[in-house]
């Protein structure tokens, strides 16, 4: 239980975004978390029952996706993010626009190294009725090297290191409250989520997948996730996360022109301990019980 509480605390900030993005890669969910945390039902599932044909198509997709994920050892890509909430503006037709837009880079190395860095962003200013650019050094930025998580907290001018307990190293990213994201294993996904293929009839080059949480531990983080995979190679194109209790949502899109699979990463340089910026304070935190 201590491991779950620790990861839940960390994931509520930095690694939560990482988990939502690396849904597309095949790390397993330890049985311990499933037994300890995913026992309380989230309520009646909203997903409709599937026909035998629909169930067979879903099963085929999940098995193929798991096999594809298992082959990926490193990945890097440019991402774009749009955030929609109650403060979002609307266009002339009443369609809600993004409250904020951002772009950055994501890097991953199996089984537990990751980097997430927002490099540019802009946010809606309701008084000016325009999008204001935000400072370049204000975006979310963190690095996980498998033994520690380094998080830049720009508003506090801090670089924080959170050391992971030894028993969690090598699998730390996968041991959070969202095994769906890091555990693209067919059996795990079916146990924890109500899933169905929702690809529009007019779309032929993508596969759209919807997932609804079956348990409260997952429903606390999202009410629904929609994934878009490229049909040619089952690599990620976009992910849309609907927040609990409302219409707020985050949309991520991954630029296929910048996607590098199993090449282009320096495992030492890309995931090493970051330098503390001038004027920042370095703070080291120990994991509970370590």
Q: Which role does the model predict for each range below?
A:
Residues 14-31:
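Bacterial N-terminal signal peptides
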Residues 79-83, 110-112, 120-122, 148, ...:
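A mature extracytoplasmic/lumenal domain signature
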Residues 56-151, 155:
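N-terminal mature ectodomain segment of secretory-pathway/periplasmic proteins
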Residues 150-180:
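Acidic/charged, solvent-exposed loop-and-adjacent secondary-structure segments enriched in E/D, K/R, S/T
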Residues 71-78, 111-117, 203-212, 233-240:
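Short, hydrophobic/aromatic-rich segments at coil-to-beta transitions
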Residues 1-15:
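N-terminal secretory signal peptides that target proteins for export/translocation
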Residues 35-49, 155, 203, 215-224, ...:
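Non-transmembrane domains of secretory- and envelope-associated proteins
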Residues 189-224:
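A mid-sequence, solvent-exposed acidic-amphipathic segment
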